[in-house]
Amino acid sequence: MLVMSISYLHSIQDVSFVYETGDRPVLVLCSDMQQYICKYMRPNSTIAYKLACELIGAQMADAWNLNTPPVAIVNIKPNHWNNSVSHSIGAPAIGFRKMENVLDVASTTYKQVTPNKDTLYQLLKIALFDFWIANEDRTCNNANLLYNVETEQIISIDYGGVLNNVLFDNPLSQLTETDSILCADIFAHICKAVSPKTLFQNVQLLEKDYYKCIGRGKKQKAVLQTMPKEWSLSADKVALKIDELFATQWIEETWQNFVECLMSNSNYGK
């Protein structure tokens, strides 16, 4: 498998919307005629590593064959910025294509997700991915998931909290049980609709797939070559952090942690 192809795009219109969330991402129409939700450099010492996490997370999610929006490096032209948005001039943004015909999975919408063995497998795989990549931003209170009702695809979004929320100066640490989507209502909703046998079979399949995902992920380590130089990242620091994901002990502990969390939140193993 080749390294995920990254598109390099530029804005062709003014920023059309500013999302009033923590990172204040912006929506912009790009040169491929698609709209992208973009996160960008700001006068902040840690934001570059957060952008790196977004890119690493997106590429690893692709290696895992998760449903995730296409990603691009976006040059938002100076005259297209909204004056109310503080940003670093000249530094490219990271953009995720805006998905159409999807709903945001939340406490008021999760029951619209069709509960069956396929959506169960998708959610289990996303949960395992989060354990492996130490994604602290997807929790029972913040799913960071979209859902396409027509195709029954669960779509993973937002990777700024991977690698333990940008703590690049410390070793990776395993997520706690409450950090997992397995503790969320959507998992209980899907899990109670399938048999214990189906759950067991899905976990067996996932364990086999896990090691294949790790193998494909190793080929994505060239992600470093795609990071804009304007982000002024320490390539050595990022490389060491990515290497931690592929340590044998980390891979084994991740699976064990995932299974323990699964047992606490389902009838698996009972």
Range-by-range predicted roles:
Residues 72-75, 138-145, 193-194, 202-207:
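A general structural signal for short secondary-structure boundary/capping elements
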Residues 95, 100-109, 121-123:
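Ordered, amphipathic secondary-structure segments that act as subunit-interaction surfaces
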Residues 110-168:
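Conserved kinase catalytic-core segment
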Residues 62-66, 94, 119-123, 170-172, ...:
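Glycine-rich loops and low-complexity Gly/Arg-rich segments
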Residues 154-270:
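C-terminal catalytic region of ATP-dependent kinase domains
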Residues 13, 19-23, 90, 120-136, ...:
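A short, terminal or domain-edge coil/loop segment
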